[in-house]
Amino acid sequence: MSDTASSGPSRFGFFLAPYHPLTGNPTLQLQRDLELVELADRLGYAEAWVGEHHSAGLEIIAAPEVFLAAAAQRTSRIRLGTGVNSLPYHQPLMLADRLCLLDHLTMGRTMMGVGPGQLATDAAMLGIDPVRQRDMMHESMAVLVRLLRGETVTAETDWYRLGEARLQLLPYQPGGMEMAVASTISPSGAVLAGRHGAGLLSLAASDPSGYEALVPNWKVYEKTLLEHGHTVDRSRWRLVAPMHLAETREQAMRDAEWGVGHLVDYIEKLSGRTAPWGQSPRDAVRQWVGEGFPAFGRATIGTPDDAIATIEKLTEQSGGFGTFLLLGLNVADWEATQRSARLFAEHVIPHFTGANRNRIASLEWADANSERMIGGLQAGIQSAFDKHGKTLAAALGADEEGR
């Protein structure tokens, strides 16, 4: 691993759906999610994003704002994002109100992530037509940004009505709350983000189709930003990919085998199909790092060097982005999950931030000038002896006489 400066993202964080096995204690699972955000804060990660889901059993955070309010009490620096609020599920004024409250409780550390909603089961329970979800997301965003700017809004659609609606509490952050729009393969998210000057949150960067869509979606985003008078800034682009690290690849594979079964079961039940590679944990992990899993893409399960290689590949493919987010999947046990977070912070983050570049340059300078420096040091010592030699000799002589 090199610690010299590298092109690539300069900020890192976690993206937590989160996914939890159906076995175990859900209360303790949520506590470990909070502990992971707390650990990320101590280790210097910049961001933590937390999702919103309402069905299928594994993704058990229904209100990311509530979870993040709890996380804010345990942390001091890390920024906290809703990853993401499913806009068709919420009356826009109520959602804006809750996020402004969270921004004040976190003293300006809140980020708002938005999307159409991922799980068909969530939409079905709410009586929402999946065909309408992206249109509903656009309709909600149109008034959300106005409310967050402090405007008074009167608007009506077939699913919400606002009459002279205004927020009584605006965001804590003077420049407004940072917003990001979820993007996978279709250009819908890129269009919405560009229209409103929000950041882009690419959730499927490690999926083969999502990987190929990175550049087309960026071009749509860039074009839409410019059409609406917004500044193009790659630092506001976030990419998400699953990773688990250990000291060796074999250890990382063994770690992932511990819990990969719950993801396989989840994929099979949501798709209604049996995965041929899901018969054993080892086969499942090999599939995941090879061709990848449906919806979850390809995982990097290996060493910090493997993580660096993956991020560099994403950088090359995308043309550059600002933040890399590790998708938290709870496939390893708690101790191994913490160790993975520490390895990433210790070795991967400094590689891209160049945290040690001046230390390395300082040692290289000392090496290149060592002969001159040592010569000068020796000359200085000799000069001191020449200058004070008589005094030293006299002191030694007096000491001998005293004996």
Q: What residue spans do the PLM features occupy?
A:
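An alpha-helical appendage that flanks or caps ligand/catalytic pockets
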Residues: S2-G8, V131-L167, G210-G322, I349-R403
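Acidic (Asp/Glu)-rich catalytic clusters
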Residues: T4-S7, D41-R42, L68-R77, L99, ...
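Conserved, mostly hydrophobic/aromatic
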Residues: A40, G44, E52, A71, ...
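N-terminal beta1-alpha1-beta2 module of alpha/beta enzyme domains
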Residues: M1-L80, G175-M177, L363-W365, A393-R403
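Glycine-rich, proline-tolerant flexible connector loops at the mouths of alpha/beta enzymes
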Residues: E47-A71, S86, Q118, A205-G210, ...
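Active-site mouth loops of central-metabolism enzymes
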Residues: L16-Q31, N85-L93, Q173-I185, H244-A246, ...
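Hydrophobic faces of well-ordered beta-strands that scaffold small-molecule active sites
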Residues: F12-L16, A48-V50, L80-T82, T110-V114, ...
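Flexible, glycine-rich active-site loops centered on histidine and acidic residues
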Residues: S7-L28, P88-W159, G199-S202, S206-V215
